[in-house]
Amino acid sequence: RGLVGSEMCIRDRFIDGKWIKASSGETYEVINPASEEILGHASKASPEDVEKALKSAQQGLEVWKKTTPWQRSYILRRIADKMREKQDVLAKWMTLEMGKPLNEAKGEVNGAADIFEWNAEETKRIYGQTVESRFEDTRVHVYYQPVGVVAALVPWNFPLVLSSRKISTGLAAGCSVIVKPDIITPGVVMELVEICRECGVPPGAVSYTHLRAHETST
């Protein structure tokens, strides 16, 4: 792992609740565009690693979808609070990785935390319906269930807001999520995934991997 300051490091893949190296052992350089300094080396996942992430996410889905909406809401709110606590670290990542001015990066952190907080409340409002039937002795009940594993592909220009929008919405609905950031901005998304782990998201409910787009689609 390459250290970037005292609190920051480039991590590896996150599968089944653990940070692990890519099976190929390959890495790529994460570079500061302003100074061309190497910030660290991120693990480059293989298609086989993605299959492992999918398997873990399927297992995580079975656990997470059975977690009550109120408990999911509590965890999402904790993530929002933790993001605000770590505002400086998250903002610094964006400034180093993609050159966003620090004040703008801090604003993005606040916006991303607000998204988690919003979805924490929406989790409690996943209501079903009772519909009148055309038969006198029948009622129609509608229940909403998680659809499965979410693939969250995150662009480089707003890495924290857009990853938060996808991760928090998927988790709120009871789905598990595999997040893949742009290769330019892995660090800030890694930090968000680590916050999810710290705040009680169970293994497999959130996974993280790097892979180039043409490899991901195959």
Each model region followed by its residue ranges:
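Terminal low-complexity tails and localization/encapsulation signals of metabolic enzymes
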Residues: S6-E7, R11-H41, Y74, R78, ...
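Glycine-rich loop-to-alpha-helix module at the N-terminal edge of alpha/beta enzyme cores
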Residues: E37-Y127, D137
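Conserved small/polar residues in nucleotide/adenosyl-binding loops
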Residues: L3-D12, T209-T216
